[in-house]
Design a protein with these regions (language model features):
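Surface-exposed, low-hydrophobicity beta-strand/loop segments enriched in small/polar/acidic residues
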Residues: 1-47, 53, 75, 94-98, ...
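Small/polar beta-strand repeat architecture
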Residues: 46-123
Length: 167
C-alpha cells in the first residue's frame, strides 16, 4: 500500500489554504455564538458574492456584470431564507442578461430575491455549525478524498477557525 503524506492548513478567516492539485482528506472547524458555515471551493480566484431567488426549480442569480456565458460551469453556495435554500453544487449556467444567469436546482421551492449566494469555478463541500457550537467539529472524507484541481479556498462565515487536511 502506497503512503501519501498529508498536510494541513489553518485559517481564521476566508482565504486560500493551498494552490494546485490536491485531495481534500478532512475538515475541522470551531464555531462561534452564531450559527456558521464553511464553504469549500476549488479555485484560483476568490469566490464572488451575488444574490439569488428561486421559483420552483429555477434559481436566478444576480451579479452586476458577471461576465459569464451560457454553458459555463460554476460552483455555487446559497444562503438560507425562510427555512429554505438553493442546493449547493456545480451547475451549468444559462445567461439571461449582463447581470443575471439561471441554474436548475435539483430541489424546488420559493425563495425571495436578494438572498445571498457565492460562486466560483467549482464547489467541493459545505459544512454548518449551530449557534453556540464552540467545540471542534471534524469531518473525515471517505475514500481518497475530494479532488481539487486548482486550489482550495475556504469561505468562512461565523467561524472561529477552520483546518483542512489534504495531500
Amino acid at each position: 500500500m502506497m503512503q501519501t503524506d498529508v498536510k494541513s492548513g489553518h485559517l481564521n478567516n476566508s482565504g486560500f489554504v493551498v494552490l494546485g492539485r490536491n485531495r481534500l482528506k478532512a475538515v475541522s472547524m470551531v464555531g462561534t455564538a452564531t450559527a456558521g458555515t464553511l464553504d469549500i471551493f476549488d479555485t484560483t480566484t476568490a469566490p464572488v458574492a451575488a444574490t439569488y431567488s428561486r421559483t420552483a426549480a429555477v434559481i436566478t442569480v444576480t451579479k452586476v456584470a458577471h461576465g459569464l456565458v451560457t454553458g459555463n460551469v460554476v460552483g455555487i453556495t446559497f444562503a438560507t431564507a425562510s427555512g429554505s435554500s438553493g442546493t449547493n453544487g456545480n451547475y451549468t449556467i444559462t445567461r439571461t442578461g449582463a447581470d443575471t444567469f439561471t441554474v436548475t436546482d435539483i430541489n424546488s421551492g420559493t425563495i425571495a430575491g436578494g438572498t445571498a449566494a457565492t460562486y466560483s469555478s467549482l464547489w467541493l463541500a459545505s459544512y454548518d455549525t449551530g449557534a453556540s457550537d464552540l467545540f471542534g467539529n471534524f469531518a473525515l472524507i471517505p475514500g481518497e478524498g475530494i479532488l481539487a484541481i486548482n486550489g482550495i479556498y475556504l469561505s468562512m462565515s461565523n467561524l472561529l477557525s477552520a483546518n483542512i487536511y489534504y495531500g
